[in-house]
Structures are given as structure tokens and as C-alpha cells.
A protein has these predicted regions:
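N-terminal pre-Walker A segment at the start of P-loop NTPase domains
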Residues: 1-13
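Extracellular glycan-modifying ectodomains
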Residues: 6, 49-54, 66
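Phosphate-binding P-loop
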Residues: 17-24
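Hydrophobic anchor at the beta1->P-loop junction of P-loop NTPases
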Residues: 29
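A conserved segment at the C-terminal end of the G1
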Residues: 35-51
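Catalytic donor-sugar/metal-binding loop of nucleotide-sugar-dependent glycosyltransferases
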Residues: 48-52, 160-163
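PAPS-dependent sulfation machinery
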Residues: 56-141, 200-205
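PAPS-dependent sulfotransferase catalytic domain
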Residues: 129, 133-134, 138, 144-241
Length: 241
């Protein structure tokens, strides 16, 4: 005798959701390369109840895929909520916390390294939700060029998120962007959302100006990228008001 679990009134296309949450407050420090966001993140993380800075590459990837229409809105919003909660959950017991001494995001660069060293030996897992409730920590995330594609963040986290955009004189950012193009574009260490253009692999931000991107040198690419990012950022600000 055989039967099917799929009945006549099943969901044909599921909506991805996450309604509950652990992180009550999230602060995101964002900006273009060379703007000084890591320095500001370190200062902000020294404030009361704010956790040490952590990079949020997963959230960046989700938002970029959504921007490229490669991920549906419900999935993008749910994943932003999942990643913020998961990061705080792990951090509250120093799981996946960076102990590499020289890194900018290292425990040893934090205002209170001992807090994270103690967590290694404390009880974890089941007690973490209650610890979060009692201590009310603020998750501190540092991101790269996120504001320009940040709709899933604002819609997913709503009034739980504080978004800080770091802006610097464009000359210094241009220098850093140019260096990135000279050193990182063909480097397999640069884990990025890329798009296919003919036989070429281009960064996601070259979308809709691929031919121009290919024809430019490193300095020109940096200028066009900065301009395009600023335009997208301003558009997002207007739409999210």
C-alpha cells in the first residue's frame, strides 16, 4: 500500500519567513573601500553593550543577489534575519569569534578582549537566549557597499537596525578602489558575487555597464564604480524614507 504526503491542498510555492528573533538591536557600519569604516566600527564597538565588530559578508551576498533579481524578496528578508540572529548567538559564546591576533576584527583588538575569552568557558547553547535577554547586547556589523543594495536589511530588521554610512573625501577612496582593482579582481581570495559576460567573470557592480567596465583601466573602473555606488545609495535612501 502506498500513499503520498502531498495532498490536494498543499502549498504550491512556500513563502520563506522568520518571525522570532534574538537580536534586539543591530548597528551596521557601512561604506565604500577606503572610507575608514573599520576604524569607526572599532570605536562604536567600545560603547556600552555593543559587541566587538564582525564582518557580515553573508548579508552582503544576500542583498547583492536580491539586487540582481536572483533571490526572491521573502527569502532575502528571512535570511537577513537568520544571519543577524545566528551571528549574535554564536558571538555570545565566542563560537566563530576571531582570535587571530593581527586581524582588525580580532578579539585582541576589541575594547574588552577578556569578555570573549571568558565566554569560551561559560555554558552555551540552551542558556544563550536568556543571556541575550538579560544582557541586551547590540550586534555590531561592518559591511562593504551594503547601503546601495540594502532593502532586505531595512525591511527585514525595521526599527531594530541602526545604519551608519561612513563618507570620506573621494580621493582616498579612489586610491583604495584602484589598488583593489589592481590586486584583487583576478585573485581567488576575493570571494564576491560575480556575473558572466561572454567568457569573462565580472563583479556584480559591473551589471548593466559590462562593456564599459571591460574597456576601462583600474583608475577608470574605480571612478565609475564609486559613481554608480553613490547613485544606487542615494536611490535606496529615497526609497527607504
Amino acid at each position: 500500500m502506498s500513499y503520498s504526503l502531498i495532498g490536494k491542498e498543499h502549498i504550491s510555492e512556500p513563502t520563506i519567513i522568520r518571525l522570532k528573533h534574538l537580536a534586539e538591536k543591530i548597528v551596521i557600519v557601512d561604506g565604500q573601500p577606503g572610507c575608514g569604516k573599520t576604524m569607526f566600527s572599532t570605536i562604536i564597538s567600545a560603547m556600552d553593550r555593543v559587541e566587538m565588530l564582525t564582518y557580515a559578508f553573508e548579508i552582503e551576498f544576500v542583498c547583492r543577489l536580491f539586487h540582481l533579481k536572483k533571490m526572491k524578496k521573502d527569502a532575502a528578508i528571512a535570511m537577513v534575519r537568520m544571519f543577524t540572529d545566528h551571528k549574535l548567538y554564536q558571538m555570545m559564546m565566542s563560537r566563530e569569534t576571531n582570535f587571530r591576533y593581527s586581524d582588525l576584527s580580532s578579539v585582541f583588538k576589541a575594547a574588552d578582549p577578556w569578555r570573549y575569552l571568558k565566554r569560551i568557558f561559560q555554558e552555551g547553547d540552551m542558556v544563550i537566549p536568556e543571556r541575550i535577554k538579560n544582557q541586551n547586547p547590540i550586534l555590531s556589523l561592518t559591511t562593504h557597499d551594503l547601503l546601495s543594495v540594502s532593502k532586505p536589511v531595512f525591511e527585514g530588521l525595521e526599527n531594530r537596525v541602526v545604519f551608519i554610512e561612513i563618507v570620506r573625501h573621494p580621493l582616498y577612496m579612489l586610491i583604495q578602489q584602484t589598488l583593489n582593482y589592481e590586486r584583487l579582481l583576478s585573485d581567488p581570495r576575493d570571494v564576491q558575487i560575480n556575473i558572466k559576460h561572454g567568457d569573462d567573470e565580472l563583479p556584480y557592480y559591473a551589471y548593466q555597464w559590462e562593456k564599459l567596465f571591460i574597456s576601462c583601466n583600474a583608475v577608470e573602473r574605480a571612478i565609475y564604480t564609486m559613481d554608480n555606488t553613490i547613485r544606487l545609495t542615494n536611490k535606496t535612501k529615497m526609497e527607504m524614507r
